[in-house]
Amino acid sequence: MQPTSTTTKHIFVTGGVASSLGKGLTASSLGALLKARGLRVTMQKLDPYLNVDPGTMNPFQHGEVFVTNDGAETDLDIGHYERFLDVDLDGSANVTTGQVYSQVIAKERRGEYLGDTVQVIPHITNEIKHRIRRMAAEDVDVVITEVGGTVGDIESLPFLETVRQVRHEVGRDNVFVVHISLLPYIGPSGELKTKPTQHSVAALRNIGIQPDAIVLRADREVPTAIKRKISLMCDVDETAVVACPDARSIYDIPKVLHTEGLDAYVVRKLDLPFRDVDWTTWDDLLDRVHNPDHEVTVALVGKYIDLPDAYLSVTEAIRAGGFANKARVKVKWVTSDDCRTAAGAAEHLGDVDAICIPGGFGERGVDGKVGAIRYARENKVPLLGLCLGLQCIVIEAARSLAEIPDANSTEFDAATSHPVISTMEEQLAYVEGAGDLGGTMRLGLYPAKLAEGSLVREAYDGQPYVEERHRHRYEVNNAYRSELEKKAGLVFSGTSPDNKLVEYVEYPRETHPYLVATQAHPELRSRPTRPHPLFAGLVKAAVARQVAAAKGADA
C-alpha cells in the first residue's frame, strides 16, 4: 500500500481507573507491531512528576533508572520501548513536569516572554508541544507518546490538554488516541464490571479527548458482550475495543494485540503505508520463551528486591540470556543482607545455578553482596557483577585473598585505610556537597578496551573495543591494581582506552568457570531478540554447571 500522506502521525496512549495497567508495555507492543509492518517508529514518555528526572528518586518509589546512550536518566518505560522496538532512544524520549517548568521559568527569567503573564496555557502546554513535535523527524512515520499517570490525576492535566491541542493543530486524521482501562472482576457476582471504564472515558472526554481505541486490561478473557457494551457506551468502534487479558509472557502481548486487530485498525485510521506483519524474529523469540531445552535458577542478590521494578532491566537481561541458550530462567530474589554470613549465603544460594550482583548505592546490603561473591568464588558458581557488583568483587578479593581485611570503598567509609574503591576525581566536588547530585554522575555510553584471551573478550565475540552505558561516581583505585592481580589473582580484563579506569574484572577460567563483572550497566543494551553477551555467558555457564552436576549424579 502506498502512503497518501507524508505527515508524521502521532499515537497517544493514556490510562484510566488505576495505575500499573501496563501502558508502557501496551505502547511498546503496538510500536513493535507497526515496526514489523515496515513503519519507522519512535516513542516518548510524558511523566507528570515534578522531579527533573528520576536520577535522585528512591528505587522503592520509582523503580529503576534507565540510562540512555547520551547519559539521560529516564523512566523505566524507556527500557520497554528500547527492548520491544530494538532501537536506541535519547533523553528527548522522556519528558517530565520538572523539565518543562524549569525550562519555562528559565525563559521567563531571560525575558523571552516579553512581559507576558506566564500561565499553564499557553506557556506550559506550548513547551510540552515543542517536546512532542520535535520527535516528529523526517525519518519517523509514527511517534507513540505515553502519557504517565491516570486520567483524573491533577498532575496529568497539562499533558492531556496538550494532547488535545496537538490533535487540533496537526489534524484529527494524523492523531490516534489509545485509552487503556481496567475491567475489575467482582468475585461474588462473577462479573467483569464496565462502569469504571465508562467513567474513565467520560473524564477523558470532559478534557476534550475522545479515544479512538480502548484496550481493556483484565485478569481473564473478556466476553464479546462486554466489548459491545463498552463500544456503545464509550462511542468507540467495536473493532477498536481490544481485550488484553494477562499474558503468560510480556512478549506475547504483540500477538494478543494483533489478534484483536489493533495494529490493523491504527494503520487504517491513520492512512499509513504498511505491509503484513513480519513475524520471523518475534516467532523465533516466542519459541525460545515457551519451548526451552533447559531450566536454570539465577539468584539476584540485591537490596531493593521488595520492588522488582528496581531491577527491571537486569531481570529482563537475565531472561534474554536464557533465550540465547534455549533456557527458561527462574529469577530467585535474595535479600543481600541474608548473605552476610557464610551460613546465610549457603542457605539462600545453595540451590541456584548462577548469581547476579546488580548495581546500587549506599552501605546497606554491601556486606551481604560480598558474602554472596565469596560463596560463588569458593563454590565455582557462575556470577555476573554489575557496577556496584564489580566493586564488591574487588572488595571481596582484597579482603579474602590479598590479605587486606579492612579493604573498603570510600562510598561506605570515607576514612577507610585501604580504599580499594575510591571516588572518581571529577566526582569529588559532588560527593563533598559542592555541586548538585542530580545528573552529575559518569553517565551514558563509554568505550572500553578488552584484554586479549579474556572471558569478556570471548563473550563479546573477540571484539577488542566495546561500548556500554554507565552510571556511577566510584571506581577501582589504581593504586591497588597490581597488588590485587598478584595476590588475589584478579584479572583487570577491560579498561578505558587510556587505561585509567577499570571497566571489567574476572578470574581466570582455570580458577573459576565464569566470575565476571563490569563497571557498566550492560543490562541497558540487552534486547529479547539480541541478548547481551555477558548475560548469555552467565546463563551458558549456569546450564553447563547444571548439566555437569546431572552427569555426576548419574555416574
Curated annotation (Swiss-Prot):
Pathway assignment:
Pyrimidine metabolism; CTP biosynthesis via de novo pathway; CTP from UDP: step 2/2
Task: Summarize where ATP binds, as residue positions.
Answer: 20-25, 77
A Gene Ontology cellular component where this protein is annotated is: cytosol
Any one GO MF term held by the record is: glutaminase activity
**Keywords associated with the record:** ATP-binding, Glutamine amidotransferase, Ligase, Magnesium, Metal-binding, Nucleotide-binding, Pyrimidine biosynthesis
For this protein, the Enzyme Commission number is 6.3.4.2
The record ties this protein, via InterPro entries, to: Class_I_gatase-like, CTP_synthase, CTP_synthase_N, GATASE, GATase1_CTP_Synthase, P-loop_NTPase
User: What reaction does this catalyse?
Assistant: UTP + L-glutamine + ATP + H2O = CTP + L-glutamate + ADP + phosphate + 2 H(+); L-glutamine + H2O = L-glutamate + NH4(+); UTP + NH4(+) + ATP = CTP + ADP + phosphate + 2 H(+)
| Superkingdom to which the source organism belongs | Bacteria
Which residues does the record give as Mg(2+) binding sites? 77, 146
Task: Report the function annotation for this chain.
Answer: Catalyzes the ATP-dependent amination of UTP to CTP with either L-glutamine or ammonia as the source of nitrogen. Regulates intracellular CTP levels through interactions with the four ribonucleotide triphosphates.
**Note from the entry:** CTPSs have evolved a hybrid strategy for distinguishing between UTP and CTP. The overlapping regions of the product feedback inhibitory and substrate sites recognize a common feature in both compounds, the triphosphate moiety. To differentiate isosteric substrate and product pyrimidine rings, an additional pocket far from the expected kinase/ligase catalytic site, specifically recognizes the cytosine and ribose portions of the product inhibitor.
Summary of subunit composition and partner proteins: Homotetramer.
Write down what this protein is called: CTP synthase
* Biological source species: Streptomyces griseus subsp. griseus (strain JCM 4626 / CBS 651.72 / NBRC 13350 / KCC S-0626 / ISP 5235)
